[in-house]
């Protein structure tokens, strides 16, 4: 989809060929985390046309109106409409807690009460929320030869989240994740990259 392959993803691969390769590899179905919502979701579904049994789409949400009074109502509407269009989960990307900011320049937190509408609506619809909060803990410590990932950080400096003026600490992010999960016992959460 668009998030990982860019605007021209529709021409990047042949869906029929891709599905054939998946089936040859023993894949019964695939979960697409890049479903978006609205017109972008329709575009994705057109790309998957004829192979709907092969893909489960997870929706993404629009956080540009996070500080607006109608954020909760708009978000609930998007979730319900995307569900009616066939989405079977919600994907919260790590950019939410790492790069997105509120109107005061503070990081957006997944345990903010304004997000309750996301988790409560997911529970009501019996769909999971896949919440990608952070990257490896080493990316949140200064780059040095003592950092187990220093070579990766040398090659990809944009993965360095050690600046506490800009990013929450890894521990803060994990506590935020724990707060979110604990306060929504009826919601199914998928926490990726555990290990």
PLM segments and residue spans:
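An N-terminally biased module of ancient metal coordination in phosphate/nucleic-acid-related enzymes
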Residues: 1-50
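Active-site neighborhood of phospho(di)ester-bond hydrolases with catalytic His/Asp-centered motifs
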Residues: 1, 31-34, 58-60, 91, ...
């Amino acid at each position: 989809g668009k998030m990982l392959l860019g605007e021209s993803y529709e021409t990047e691969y042949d869906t029929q060929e891709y599905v054939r390769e998946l089936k040859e590899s023993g894949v019964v179905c695939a979960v697409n985390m890049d479903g978006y919502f609205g017109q972008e979701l329709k575009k994705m579904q057109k790309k998957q046309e004829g192979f709907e049994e092969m893909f489960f789409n997870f929706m993404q949400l629009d956080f540009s109106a996070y500080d607006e009074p109608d954020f909760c109502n708009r978000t609930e509407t998007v979730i319900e409409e995307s569900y009616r269009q066939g989405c079977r989960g919600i994907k919260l990307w790590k950019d939410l807690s790492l790069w997105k900011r509120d109107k005061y320049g503070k990081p957006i937190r997944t345990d903010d009460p304004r997000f309750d509408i996301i988790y409560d609506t997911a529970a009501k619809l019996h769909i999971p929320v896949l919440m990608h909060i952070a990257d490896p803990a080493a990316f949140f410590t200064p780059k040095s030869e003592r950092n187990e990932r220093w070579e990766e950080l040398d090659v990809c400096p944009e993965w360095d989240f050690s600046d506490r003026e800009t990013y929450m600490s890894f521990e803060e992010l994990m506590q935020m994740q724990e707060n979110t999960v604990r306060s929504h016992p009826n919601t199914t959460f998928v926490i990726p990259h555990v290990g």
